From Swiss-Prot:
InterPro entries referenced in this protein's UniProt entry, alphabetically: Pectin_lyas_fold, Pectin_lyase_fold/virulence, Phage_T7_tail_fibre-like_N, RHGA/B-epi-like_pectate_lyase
Localization of this protein: Virion
Protein name per Swiss-Prot or TrEMBL: Depolymerase 1, capsule KN3-specific
UniProt keywords, alphabetically: Degradation of host capsule during virus entry, Degradation of host cell envelope components during virus entry, Host-virus interaction, Lyase, Viral attachment to host adhesion receptor, Viral attachment to host cell, Viral tail protein, Virion, Virus entry into host cell
Pfam families per the UniProt record, alphabetical: Pect-lyase_RHGA_epim, Phage_T7_tail
Organism: Klebsiella phage KN3-1 (Bacteriophage KN3-1)
Subunit (UniProt): Interacts (via N-terminus) with depolymerase 2 (via N-terminus); this interaction probably gives rise to a branched tailspike.
Recorded family membership: In the N-terminal section; belongs to the Teseptimavirus fiber family. Belongs to the Teseptimavirus fiber family.
GO biological process, one term: symbiont entry into host cell via disruption of host cell envelope
Lineage: superkingdom: Viruses
Free-text domain note: The N-terminus anchors the RBP to the virion. The central part and C-terminus probably binds and degrades the host exopolysaccharides.
Annotated GO CC locations: virus tail
Molecular function as annotated in GO: lyase activity
Function text: Functions as a receptor binding protein (RBP) and probably mediates the attachment to the host capsular exopolysaccharides. Displays a depolymerase activity that specifically degrades the KN3-type polysaccharides of Klebsiella pneumoniae capsule, which allows the phage to reach the host cell membrane and bind the entry receptor.
Length: 792
């Protein structure tokens, strides 16, 4: 559960200046207070504190009696920063401020709820070590009680205890002296007559080489006897007097207090570990109970020589850890275990110990070497819950840790390497999967798990085959493969790198590397995202190493309708990622829909006639950098509605001799597409655009970032709505349609005169008649309320 408080911060007193860590719309919405556990004082601006800067305040009063300084944002819900009235000019900044004020109010309401008494992850109310005041007395058995009730109850119990102390004062005095006597050794076990009574005994002498001072605990056949009721002990005679005579064969065991410890008896007793303490204050038995149970394959007969098949020993070690309710299986370092398949299955764990953790851990050089067998559902290492339907469908394998070992396959086998199916709370750390003909890593219905530093290499295609599996494959039923985090993972030397298929949601990839290699695929896309949503890639790297006639990265538009409820919803996000193509491609390199790229870099040789970037519907490209290395100048294709390209920088390594910077396809019907802000480095494109006629009447904007007239190197037009023209370069424009209020268009007649034709009534010049721009001349147009006017 997200417990972060964003709009309230407290600092310890001692300083005079304090930072404001949140944004605010007005200083009157910021409150500075002095706070202690039982007092609060709201300070006044200017007289009791002042602003040093927009994000820092300075106290002007003493803090005596208070231990904290609180800075809180409290945005007014009634005092609006922006008021709208009929006929006013609607500006984006006003809308942003109004929207931000609402967002601030909502954020502060959430923080207030969290600070009141939030729920923890288990749904329990969390007072966060604060008092709950004005609590009514409890009535029902499950009600909370207040301190008055507790004091009353303890007072009544105290009266009863005082009576007992008065009656048995001497006894308690003895106990106090006994407890303070450090020369005594307590908890020494003694068994009568070698564990078998003769029968009829009512008096038993404790025969020991040392003096026994008390017998605080006694059992007969495992049944505890109460001192003073079932038995008494006389230190003078060293005799136990029993209320009932023993029966022949009875097992009598007593724990005694002696003057010194017969260590051999203590260690040999059934409870010896409970009687030996440690520096931590815990007994040996308690430490053993709290420690995970350790198992090794060698305990079950594993050889670990890389030649002997250790499948049974490995499986027995895992099953032993599972059946004991959780434990650790330790793989020996610098050891190779040969195996057919290994199964970590939910049904092998007791239901009562469902929450116990299973750890399989290696050290340097721990290797599981697969024999190539494709039995056990064709998976080498399989972690799974119960496979079934109905109530069985919800029984997941949980809390498994795989750490510090390798799973090496046989490339001639089609087996999958590491498979997680119907599992949750799995953690993988530093696991290496290599040389499997099937998927190196496969996740089916996996959620709430962390995959850290997983490396998959040389997986996916059996030698000689042209169609294979993905190095990393993630899928699920509906939205079950969700809420997983992949950190610093690497998929390398795999022809098909990663596929995220239907049923995946809320999967996050951070600082991962996906590099193609080994074989050039001829049919499937190396990076394929289909029917998945709300995926995030951050600081990841994608590398293509082969000349290819197929698309490298594909995000399909076949998304579940339930998830895509609005036309501008973004479902796959790439942030600060890099895409590198070191070879020629003759197909679209990156072909996506419902995808957002933010601050990403694309380096492409673009050896073919297609476009490196092809954006389908609901796609966004912001602050991107594209490098084109060849003379083929194609850069970007926009083929879907509701898309945006903002602040795009294109670097040409050489002057393009063909292609266009941007192409609009999908006509007629393309609408709501905006290209706003672009720059070129080194060289200009061969042609700026193509195919941008017959839009559905919605705005399509092409505005060059920081446009400055660039003489003979400049193209015909930068910044336009839809247009059509005729003539050489062109000679006449007579149909400049649509646009938006305030849009400016710069027209440059590069090699021939250009006529602005007003016959259609769509362009109105200063003179009201046609205007001809001479060769290499420039004119500026502005859209005012849907009508184009000439500025110069």
């Amino acid at each position: 559960m997200d417990q972060d408080i964003k709009t309230v911060i407290q600092y310890p007193v001692g300083a005079t200046e304090f930072d404001i860590p949140f944004d605010y719309l007005s200083r009157k919405f910021v409150r500075v207070s002095l706070v202690s556990d039982d007092n609060r004082r709201l300070l006044s601006n200017i007289t009791e504190y002042r602003y040093v800067s927009k994000t820092r305040v300075k106290l002007l009063v003493e803090t005596t009696g208070f231990d904290r300084v609180e800075i809180r944002r409290f945005t007014s819900a009634s005092e609006r920063i922006v008021d709208f009235s009929d006929g006013s000019v609607l500006r984006a900044n006003d809308l942003n401020v109004s929207q931000l004020q609402s967002a601030h109010i909502a954020e502060e309401a959430r923080d207030s709820a969290l600070m009141a008494m939030p729920q923890d992850d288990a749904g329990n109310l969390d007072a966060r070590n604060r008092r709950i005041v004005r609590l009514a007395p409890g009535i029902d058995g499950t009600d909370a009680i207040n301190k008055d009730q507790l004091d009353t109850t303890l007072g009544e119990a105290g009266g009863i205890l005082s009576e007992i102390i008065e009656v048995k004062g001497d006894f308690y005095e003895y106990l106090e002296k006994f407890a303070e006597d450090t020369s005594m050794i307590r908890g020494v076990v003694w068994v009568y007559n070698a564990g078998s009574a003769v029968g009829g005994e009512t008096v038993v002498k404790v025969e020991k080489p040392t003096t026994v001072y008390s017998v605080p605990y006694l059992e007969i056949n495992g049944s505890r006897q109460e001192i003073g009721y079932h038995y008494d002990f006389d230190p003078a005679t060293q005799e136990l007097t029993l209320a009932k005579p023993l029966v022949a064969g009875d097992f009598l065991m007593a724990m005694t207090t002696e003057s010194y410890l017969p260590i051999e008896s203590l260690l040999a007793s059934p409870v010896g570990a409970e009687a030996i303490g440690t520096k931590s204050g815990k007994t040996i038995q308690r430490i053993l109970d709290e420690s995970p149970r350790y198992f090794t394959p060698e305990m079950f007969g594993a050889k670990g020589d890389g030649l002997t098949n250790d499948t049974k020993a490995l499986q027995d070690a895992v099953d032993a850890a599972m059946s004991s309710g959780g434990g650790k299986v330790i793989l020996k370092g610098n050891t190779t275990y040969l195996f057919d398949h290994l199964l970590v299955a939910r049904e092998k764990s007791p239901q009562s110990r469902f929450e116990a953790r299973l750890i399989i851990e290696g050290s340097g050089g721990s290797v599981l070497k697969h024999t190539g067998s494709i039995t056990e559902a064709a998976h080498a290492f399989w972690v799974r819950g119960v496979l079934g339907t109905g109530s069985l469908a919800d029984i997941y394998m949980r809390d498994v840790v795989l750490r510090d070992f390798s799973i090496n396959g046989t490339v001639t086998s089609t087996a999958n390497g590491l498979v997680l199916q119907r599992a949750t709370a799995v953690r993988i750390e530093n696991v290496y999967v290599n040389d499997f003909g099937g998927n190196g890593y496969r996740a089916l219905d996996l959620y709430d798990s962390t995959i850290d530093s997983l490396e998959v290499q040389r997986c996916g295609i059996v030698p000689g085959a042209t169609v294979g599996s993905y190095g990393m494959y993630i899928t699920g039923a509906y939205d079950q493969s969700n809420a997983n985090h992949y950190i610093a993972c690497r998929v390398e030397m795999c022809p098909l790198i990663i596929a995220i298929d239907k049923g995946c949601r809320h999967n996050y990839f951070h600082n991962c590397k996906f590099e193609q290699g080994r074989v050039n695929p001829t049919t499937s896309n190396p990076v394929y995202i289909n029917d998945a949503t709300e995926l995030a890639f951050e600081a990841c790297q994608f590398v293509q190493n082969y000349d290819s006639a197929i698309r490298f990265l594909v995000v399909t538009d076949a998304l579940f309708p339930y998830w895509v409820t609005h036309g501008t919803e973004k479902v796959v996000n790439f942030t600060d990622c890099s895409f590198v193509c070191s070879r020629s491609v003759t197909a679209y390199w990156i072909d996506v829909a419902y995808t957002t790229f933010t601050a990403c870099a694309f380096s492409s040789c673009n050896g073919g006639t297609q476009f490196p970037l092809s954006l389908g519907k609901n796609s966004f490209l912001t602050d991107a950098k594209v490098v084109i290395r060849t003379a083929e100048g194609n850069v970007l294709e926009l083929k879907g509605s509701h898309s945006r390209v903002t602040n795009l920088k294109v670097t040409y390594f050489q002057q393009p001799t063909s292609g266009v910077f941007i192409k609009f396809t999908g006509l007629p019907g393309l609408s709501d597409v905006v290209v706003d802000g672009f720059t070129f480095e080194n060289f200009e494109p061969f042609a700026p655009y193509s195919g941008h006629t017959d839009f559905m009447g919605d705005v399509v904007v092409m505005r060059r970032a920081g446009y400055v007239y660039n003489g003979t190197n400049d193209r015909v037009i930068y910044g336009c709505s839809t247009l059509s023209y005729s003539g050489a370069s062109p000679a006449t424009w007579n149909n400049l349609r649509n646009g938006y209020n305030g849009q400016v268009v710069i027209v440059h007649a590069k090699s021939n005169p250009v006529t602005l034709d007003v016959s259609g009534g769509l362009i109105i010049t200063k003179t009201g008649s046609n205007v001809t721009i001479p060769t290499n001349g420039v004119s500026a147009l502005v859209n005012i309320s849907g009508v184009w006017r000439q500025l110069y």
